[in-house]
Amino acid sequence: MIPLKLSGVTRILCLGAHSDDIEIGCGGTVLGLIESSDRIEFYWMVLSSNPERAKEAELSARAFLRRARTKTIVVKSFRDGFLPYIGTPVKECFEELKKAFVPDVIFTPSRHDLHQDHRFVCELTWNTFRNHLILEYEIPKYDGDLRSPNFFVPLSEAICRSKVNKLMRYFGSQRNKQWFSEDLFHGFMRLRGVEASSPTCYAEAFHCRKMLLDCHR
């Protein structure tokens, strides 16, 4: 594997359809980026919630971004499961976001995710941000829609533990779900670590469909 450092990144946009999407998909990467740099500004947006899930999303986002230099956390209240079917106000939300924040890197769900909300958020991400590095994260679930990612971020064991501990602590509404468990989250990062030949044994993985390599000084 040839490593690539994102040393010039200072503005990161994290997008999730649901309150725990970002944490599951790229929570370890977020923690690692904050650990490596105190210059990064985060904009964290969750699109759907109810009062219980909104509280979880807010508390979790604050925990993950606690050491970030600057952070903006936005939790919307669109109806879970219906994002593509109420598309106009969601699209308007993205248009407002484009004016409010200009990111260097965007984390968003995968285009191939079979959950309609995840897929729609990805579609709007690409429609709205056309000159940005977009990394599509993975969410393991019943649908069996995981593919072969092509972009990996090695994670230390300590960061993996921190990610999983925060997930289990802040998302009490999900603890009774069969897929929401410590062993799944740890095991998934361990699997991607093997695929990435990660020196730390763990990694998160993403789909990167377009990247511009600047060879000029």
Regions found by a protein language model. Give the residues of each.
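Short, solvent-exposed loop/turn segments enriched in Ser/Thr/Gly
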Residues: 206-207
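Active-site beta-strand->loop->alpha-helix modules in alpha/beta enzyme cores, enriched
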Residues: 1-19, 23-141, 147, 169, ...
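Hydrophobic/aromatic residues within well-ordered alpha-helical segments
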Residues: 53, 156-159
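Phosphate-binding/catalytic loops
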Residues: 143-157
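A charged, well-structured terminal subsegment
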Residues: 158-184
